[in-house]
């Protein structure tokens, strides 16, 4: 990664939009508030990040299984978890300009020292009505009383909009893992401890989304539910806490931009023994990347109660039957990607100009290698001899437009670790020039040695 320089959030996000990492959603129709589409670079990088998550948390560990549950679930699922009754945000409207806000957020913004997470609805309302909180839009201090705003998106199954056909877009991936616990145990013949994982889209009707892709109404989670024998909660909590920190450090995030934040007792759900967030220092301030939560047996017990199904586990070691306890490591994929892009962005002052460079980890950047024919006349040879050779092992791009210097700058700006230039000498000596993104150093390598050279560089 680059030095820990500070760049404005606007500078970074403008670069991401112009470069093709992220586009405004529905742009040709004027866009949609806080809606973003991932372009070719962003989509590829998201997939790379998910693959690294799968390798670290699933493929390299015993008894870890990934499934792909449905986005629309039986609505009783959300009654069991309490989402239908309790998944709300405290909403207030300014009486003067009619702007709408989350009560806890505007209080926290104006009084950072207050623990709004630990405040009851009544306490939040007292603060809002005290005249000490002003509208961020018009500056007045007059709000409606707090009312609870349901954050789940509601829709209907079938041709009629009746209460009996009401369903919800899932607000988290976790419950698809819990309701499939019995199926996974049966079909994998696993013993505890055992984990079930999923990476997928979730939907929350946030009142105040913002900060680019940090808080949106549609986003992706990468979640694990890890099941084990009751009494081992803190052992596995510490294990997954360390695994999650190891993962984000492996991705290249700078240590000084990361911190653990342990939840205070007032913040914890009544069933939780402990919850910790890993936060990242974004240009706009500290923000949560992921959380590790001890959920005890709450979810499985609730699903047993509402479904009338037996979700207990018979332990073959001591022949006891119990409801497993759970630790949940949960990543926000979009937030993690945004943190990596913010951390990687750099501007380097060179002798004649300034270059923008994304110091992304190898294997994480959208492209591993860029193949650059020195002249358009060399395109077919470069494609046949270099692109076709490397594309089987590496994610390659092929660029023939502009001077070689401009092409180097374009690849630096999107984080491509290596550029390979195929020139007229390559036709004679079967060698190419390999340029390193970070050092800008160049070496001449035989084409038939490229795979071995790059395998070593990428640690494969």
Give the residues covered by each predicted segment:
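NTP/phosphate- and nucleic-acid-binding module
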Residues: 1-460
């Amino acid at each position: 990664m680059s030095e820990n320089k500070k760049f404005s959030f606007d500078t970074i996000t403008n670069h991401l939009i112009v470069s093709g990492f992220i586009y405004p959603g529905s742009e040709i129709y004027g866009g949609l508030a806080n809606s973003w589409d991932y372009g070719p670079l962003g989509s590829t990088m998201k997939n790379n990040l998910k693959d690294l998550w799968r390798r670290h948390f699933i493929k390299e560990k015993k008894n870890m299984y990934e499934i792909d549950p449905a986005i629309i679930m039986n609505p009783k699922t959300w009654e069991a978890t309490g989402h239908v009754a309790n998944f709300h945000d405290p909403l207030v409207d300014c009486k003067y300009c009619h702007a709408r806000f989350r009560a806890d957020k505007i209080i926290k913004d104006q009084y950072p020292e207050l623990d709004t997470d630990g405040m009851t609805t009544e306490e939040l309302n007292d603060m809002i009505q005290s005249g000490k909180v002003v509208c961020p839009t018009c500056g007045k201090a007059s709000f409606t009383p707090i009312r609870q705003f349901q954050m789940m998106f509601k829709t209907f199954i079938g041709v009629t909009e009746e209460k009996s056909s009401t369903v919800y877009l899932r607000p988290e991936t976790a419950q698809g893992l819990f309701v499939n616990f019995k199926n996974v145990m049966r079909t994998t013949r696993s013993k505890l401890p055992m984990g079930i994982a999923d990476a997928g889209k979730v939907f929350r009707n946030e009142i105040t989304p913002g900060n680019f892709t940090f808080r949106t109404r549609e986003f992706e989670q990468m979640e694990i539910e890890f099941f084990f024998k009751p009494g081992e909660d803190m052992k596995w909590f510490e294990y997954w806490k360390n695994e999650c920190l190891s993962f984000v450090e492996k991705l290249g995030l700078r240590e000084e931009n990361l911190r653990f934040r342990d939840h205070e007792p007032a913040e914890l759900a009544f069933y939780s023994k402990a919850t910790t967030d890993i936060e990242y220092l974004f240009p706009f301030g500290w923000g949560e990347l992921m959380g590790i939560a001890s959920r005890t047996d709450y979810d499985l017990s609730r699903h047993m109660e509402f479904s009338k199904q037996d979700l207990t586990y018979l332990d073959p070691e001591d022949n006891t039957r119990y409801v497993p306890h759970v630790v949940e490591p949960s990543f926000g994929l979009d937030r993690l990607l945004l943190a990596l892009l913010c951390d990687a962005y750099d501007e380097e002052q060179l002798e004649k100009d300034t270059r923008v460079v994304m110091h992304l980890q190898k294997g994480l950047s959208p492209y591993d290698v860029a193949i650059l024919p020195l002249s358009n006349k060399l395109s077919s040879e470069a494609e046949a001899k270099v692109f076709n050779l490397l594309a089987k092992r590496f994610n390659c791009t092929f660029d023939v437009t502009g001077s070689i210097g401009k092409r180097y700058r374009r690849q630096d700006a999107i984080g491509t670790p290596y550029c390979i230039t195929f020139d007229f000498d390559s036709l004679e000596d079967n060698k190419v020039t390999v340029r390193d993104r970070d050092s800008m150093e160049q070496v001449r390598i035989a084409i038939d040695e490229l795979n071995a050279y790059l395998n070593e560089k990428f640690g494969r």
